[in-house]
């Protein structure tokens, strides 16, 4: 979780506001940033289209989209169309059905592989405080444990210059992330946060509601709820 600056950074780019802001911080720091996105069997293509647009906007040197079909075995409303995406909000202490089993563990592992292949020293993640209340693989202790594993599991770590997992937004709420995105010039209109598919954001899923509240506080009018016909 180090914020140490290195010459090359791999950015896990989902297409959402959080990962876009994290990637933009690496770009601002003067890094050569390589984007990495995943087609993991999610409900829709909108977030991958957003990731591609964001990578182009930020001028990333490379943008890889890797197919890892976590939807093959379901286990989440984001990959299993027979499950309903909840609209009632997150219940404290309950992991929502939007949690995708093992998703971040798999994504970070592939990110570390790309980082080694490109001699990158850093992996930047958009994980933040709004995530780890519900998702076990978004918590600070998870990242610390993964960092220890990464230092043991790859050549760079064994040689004493391990690849750092950088989560610059880890203690931030969504309002702070929106404010930082605006400062960095992140094209918020190009990001996609909605859990559901369709031409327009649903405006009612938990992701849309959290995003809308933060955008509204920041004085923005481009709300998910207003994009719904």
UniProtKB/Swiss-Prot annotation:
Listed SUPFAM superfamilies: Adenine nucleotide alpha hydrolases-like
Enzyme kind, highest EC tier: ligase
Keywords noted in UniProt: ATP-binding, Ligase, Metal-binding, Nucleotide-binding, Queuosine biosynthesis, Zinc
EC number, UniProt record: 6.3.4.20
Name of the featured protein: 7-cyano-7-deazaguanine synthase
Cofactor binding, per record: Binds 1 zinc ion per subunit.
Keyword hit for Kinase: no
Residues annotated to bind Zn(2+): 194, 202, 205, 208
NCBIfam families listed in its UniProt record: 7-cyano-7-deazaguanine synthase QueC
Cited Pfam families: QueC
Single GO biological process annotation from the record: queuosine biosynthetic process
GO molecular function: ATP binding; ligase activity, forming carbon-nitrogen bonds; zinc ion binding
InterPro entries: QueC, Rossmann-like_a/b/a_fold
């Amino acid at each position: 979780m180090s914020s140490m600056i290195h010459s090359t950074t791999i950015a896990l780019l989902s297409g959402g506001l959080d990962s876009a802001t994290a990637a933009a911080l690496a770009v601002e720091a003067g890094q050569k940033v390589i984007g990495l996105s995943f087609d993991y069997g999610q409900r829709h293509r909108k977030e991958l289209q957003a990731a591609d647009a964001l990578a182009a906007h930020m001028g990333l040197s490379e943008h890889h989209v890797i197919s890892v079909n976590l939807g093959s075995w379901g286990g989440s409303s984001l990959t299993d169309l027979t499950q309903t995406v909840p609209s009632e909000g997150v219940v404290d202490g309950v992991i929502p059905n939007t949690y995708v089993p093992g998703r971040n563990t798999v994504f970070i592992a592939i990110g570390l592989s790309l980082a080694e292949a490109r001699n990158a020293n850093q992996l930047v993640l958009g994980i933040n405080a709004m995530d780890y209340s519900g998702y076990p693989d978004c918590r600070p202790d998870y990242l610390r444990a993964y960092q220890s594993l990464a230092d043991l599991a790859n050549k760079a770590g064994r040689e004493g210059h391990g690849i750092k997992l950088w989560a610059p937004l880890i203690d931030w709420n969504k309002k702070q992330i929106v404010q930082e995105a605006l400062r960095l010039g992140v094209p918020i209109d190009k990001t996609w946060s909605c859990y559901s598919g369709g031409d327009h954001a649903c405006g009612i899923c938990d992701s849309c509601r959290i995003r809308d509240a933060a955008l509204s506080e920041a004085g923005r009018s481009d709300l998910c709820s207003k994009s719904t016909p």
